[in-house]
Amino acid sequence: GQVDITVTPDKETQAQLALRIPGWTPKATVTVNGEEVQGVTTGQYLVIDRKWKAGDKVSLAVDMPARIVRLEQFVAYERGPVVLARDSRFNDGFVDEVIMPASTQNGTPTLTPATPMPGTWMTFTTPVIHGTYSDRQCDIIQMHLCDFASAGNQWDEKTRYRVWLPLLYEPMYKGGTAINGYW
């Protein structure tokens, strides 16, 4: 994501601009009028002290990685600062069914942008192991997620949504270690 700020003082002014660099991003870049600013640290403020004139442009570019947050036998998905939810309007399964995230690299989930459903701002698909225990291999499906702010906004009793998704119980799970290629 990127945020652009245009400075518009009435006259050239010496001042400090403090930008909060989000802690959830692994990488952030700040430029002033196209020149990169050094000393950018995630999770802290970056103070730019200079003479500002009308039209100066400050840009903050951040990576917005997908993340999985685990709590006991539940997981939640996030992308940058946005919490995602499973919404029954996608008709891709019961929102309370157990899943197991399928990971790609170092436990990072794959979130693929999908065509937004009417009434949603962001929509993604992600591969998950679907189903309950059996003697056969469980299927991997593409589960839909949307931004939490849009989840369930139909205001009817039929629509259900969920942020904390129940996990397929994995007795071999040890502190986030991937097992057989799955998280």
Describe each PLM feature range.
Residues 11, 42, 53-54:
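Surface-exposed loops/turns
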Residues 1-6, 41, 61-183:
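C-terminal beta-rich recognition modules with glycine/proline-rich loops and embedded aromatic residues
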Residues 12-32:
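Beta-strand-rich binding/interaction modules
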Residues 25-50, 68-72:
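Solvent-exposed beta-strand/loop surfaces of large extracellular or lumenal domains
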